[in-house]
């Protein structure tokens, strides 16, 4: 593994997963979520401050389920209903989901994973009117970000005007029709967002599988390069499991608890 760069290794793993799983269809659904990747530094025995981590490749982070930890934040994208992992990002510490939303979509587009018209399901951590708008206007995808209590549909619809780039295209009317279709679909899906909660919850079972069955819970790796490669291996193992047809909530939980 040491002979390959992180980018080469990630490309290799995602290429393997693509070859062993079913080919994608049109307008597919992706689920995106994040989890902590904790490094085993025994910080309970010896107090470690932020100053102690200056110059290190890992940072203090916070997870609502785990509390404070030292390590990274793993953001994973999986295809639904196959649950095949298709991309991941690793960040030091625990940056806010809404702040890295744009970077996530850039990565999905760069790797040609998210295509025009695809639907991406995300939890409330990614919430923000700007993020809904970016999904359609820049990335041409439908970002079903679970709304918060103060969400106003009218406010969002008022923000979704045609991007100026549409009028520079060879067929602006066709582009406008496609844009209207994205907006209409986003509105319908946000009005019924609770129907997507069981779908989004499947990625939690994927994380549980990776942590409990494949030991992603605590890594004995202390450089970002090494952590990325080992996360790649965990993603590959998860992909192999779901490629065997093990992709129901009950089956995934059974393996994770085995």
Task: Give residue spans per PLM region.
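Membrane-interface transmembrane-helix boundary segments in multi-pass integral membrane proteins
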Residues: 221-235
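Short hydrophobic/aromatic-enriched beta-strand-loop microsegments
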Residues: 139-147
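Nucleic-acid-interacting cores, centered on viral/eukaryotic replication and modification enzymes
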Residues: 199, 244, 258
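Short, charged, surface-exposed secondary-structure boundary motifs
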Residues: 99, 152-160
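Short helix-capping/linker segments at secondary-structure and domain boundaries
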Residues: 216, 238-252
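Short amphipathic alpha-helical "interface-anchor" segments enriched in bulky aromatics
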Residues: 163-224
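Polybasic low-complexity intrinsically disordered regions
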Residues: 2-124, 129-137
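Short, acidic/turn-prone active-site loops that include or flank metal/cofactor-
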Residues: 91-96, 146-152
């Amino acid at each position: 593994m040491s002979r390959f760069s992180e980018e080469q290794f990630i490309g290799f793993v995602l290429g393997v997963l693509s070859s062993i799983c079913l080919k994608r269809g049109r307008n597919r659904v992706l689920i995106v979520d994040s989890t902590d990747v904790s490094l085993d530094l025994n910080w309970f025995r010896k107090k470690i401050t932020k100053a102690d981590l200056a110059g290190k490749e890992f940072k203090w982070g916070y997870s609502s389920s785990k509390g404070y930890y030292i390590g990274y934040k793993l953001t994973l994208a999986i295809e639904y209903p196959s649950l095949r992992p298709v991309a991941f990002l690793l960040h030091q510490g625990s940056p806010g989901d809404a702040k890295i939303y744009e970077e996530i979509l850039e990565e999905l587009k760069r790797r040609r994973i998210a295509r025009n018209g695809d639907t991406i399901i995300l939890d409330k951590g990614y919430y923000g009117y700007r993020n809904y708008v970016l999904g359609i206007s820049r990335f041409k995808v439908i970002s079903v970000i679970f709304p918060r209590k103060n969400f106003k549909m009218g406010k969002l619809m008022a923000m979704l005007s045609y991007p100026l780039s549409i009028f520079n295209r060879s067929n602006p009317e066709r582009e406008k029709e496609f844009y209207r279709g994205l907006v209409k679909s986003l509105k319908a899906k946000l009005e019924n967002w609770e129907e997507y909660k069981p779908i989004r919850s499947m990625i939690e079972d994927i994380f549980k599988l990776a942590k409990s069955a494949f030991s992603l819970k605590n890594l004995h790796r202390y450089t970002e390069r090494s952590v990325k490669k080992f996360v790649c291996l965990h993603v590959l193992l998860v992909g192999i499991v779901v490629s065997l047809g093990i992709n129901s909530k009950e089956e995934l939980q059974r393996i994770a608890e085995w």
